[in-house]
């Protein structure tokens, strides 16, 4: 077997803000290293999910191995690990970054440094990586590469003269990037003879071969026939195949050694056995310590998912199980609702993650779903001294037992052109944000960095859309969790015809509860079909009704058959109708149609503007 020379390996990642051209740049690198023939080339080659290509974003980390003959005449092996750019997938990025020695930090020459660029930059710094700044999209008419290079130096402290100007579209500067990877990024360290120590940075599920973990080997080697052990669970498996990634797919090899990036098949059936971020070692010669700094991904946003047709409950469970195989961050547990029947309470990393999971369930598994309003995890301190977590607003304990309710807060970093600062500050004030810092950036563009602290629940719903509309799309944001703080929060129940509809219950700040409740009852009154009796729709905090709307009754024209004639006859018919309605009202049940839930999700969450 040919030993890989470690000094000829370069492991690197590309990090960027959404839309700064990361995937296009990866495409050019594949082309220039002749890894992909022109015939096979397609846009966003590494984004394998149909949804990724359609939305133009990278959701899962993906790896590829290419060979490059450098100007010094030597042939190098590059392992490129592509990372997601969206803030929801920060944990995926941190794992991908742990598997490499250097990163290309891609910044759009027309946009400059954005909020997520900064967040990813700090992660790469924490790992102690070599960072090569790449100013991309220099072919754009409004590109200002020199200014952006100076901004990178000012904001991130990376010397402007080290920046490489490139265009993923035309291919200009890409050769220079490849040379910089060889020159600046250090080769991996590691001893192939030491006990095996491999980091799992991603995994995919294959119907025939089970779970295929993606590995970066730090020490030792692994080959078919080896007995491996998963560090955190202690489970053991026998390796069937090992191999590397090529752009055309997975290719089996004889062995994987320290410094390499690859995959293995070992008939692993359960995704929970190989948690991403876990360490893999040999059963008979385990490594003394696992790879540090990993935690299981923890969901921060919860929503109920229910099948429109209750007969598809089993199908939904199987679909969620399958998605979880590729998505360690997704959690779900069964829940039932009087209004929606049986479904699941699902946990996500953020709103985009929730949206993508729902879209994949509908697309790949052909399900029709209803999602309840997303909510954050509240902590409740009870008078008895214990603390409970509340994932579903309907589960909030009785107010008489509650000492205080704590809500999660986030630190927001926002980059915006100067002229939008006023309207953004107004938006953040409305969202109960508190200004921590404000920093004017150098350059002719006059951009400002705003740092705020705000309740997570406030920025969960429509904040991103409103941030974009207030700033005409120029502002960008990134957030991180900063812990829990007490808040003046109340649970609002929505009653239709005197019955609480659990799926519409929400937790809100006391000051905002009234406006949100008003919007919800008005919207419900529009979408609930009229009955033969009038239907009151109310919102209540405890026993106090704070908003009400009424669906007016339908009336049959009982006088149609009376021509002229005696007025007492007409009165008798009308009285009879009234009596009948009274009886109906007492025993009548109102079905809340599915559209009503969807309508409320859009209504109740957009607070009235103005």
From Swiss-Prot:
Where, by residue number, does GTP bind?
19-24, 136-139
Where does it reside?
Answer: Cell inner membrane
- How would you classify this enzyme at the top EC level? hydrolase
One Pfam family, please name it: GTP_EFTU
The annotated topology with respect to the bilayer is: Peripheral membrane protein
- Which catalytic reaction applies to this protein? GTP + H2O = GDP + phosphate + H(+)
EC number, UniProt record: 3.6.5.n1
Q: Name one GO cellular component term.
A: plasma membrane
Q: Which InterPro entries match?
A: EF-4 (IPR006297), EFG_III/V (IPR035647), EFG_V-like (IPR000640), EFTu-like_2 (IPR004161), G_TR_CS (IPR031157), LepA_C_sf (IPR038363), LepA_CTD (IPR013842), LepA_IV (IPR035654)
Q: What biological-process terms (Gene Ontology) are attached?
A: positive regulation of translation
Q: Which GO terms describe its molecular function?
A: GTP binding; GTPase activity; ribosome binding; translation elongation factor activity
Residue limits of the tr-type G domain? 7-189
- Main location as per UniProt: membrane
What does the UniProt keyword field contain? Cell inner membrane, Cell membrane, GTP-binding, Hydrolase, Membrane, Nucleotide-binding, Protein biosynthesis
Q: What does this protein do?
A: Required for accurate and efficient protein synthesis under certain stress conditions. May act as a fidelity factor of the translation reaction, by catalyzing a one-codon backward translocation of tRNAs on improperly translocated ribosomes. Back-translocation proceeds from a post-translocation (POST) complex to a pre-translocation (PRE) complex, thus giving elongation factor G a second chance to translocate the tRNAs correctly. Binds to ribosomes in a GTP-dependent manner.
Family classification = Belongs to the TRAFAC class translation factor GTPase superfamily. Classic translation factor GTPase family. LepA subfamily.
What is the name of this protein? Elongation factor 4
Q: Which organism encodes this protein?
A: Thermus thermophilus (strain ATCC BAA-163 / DSM 7039 / HB27)
Query: Top-down, what is the taxonomic lineage of the species of origin?
Result: Bacteria, Thermotogati, Deinococcota, Deinococci, Thermales
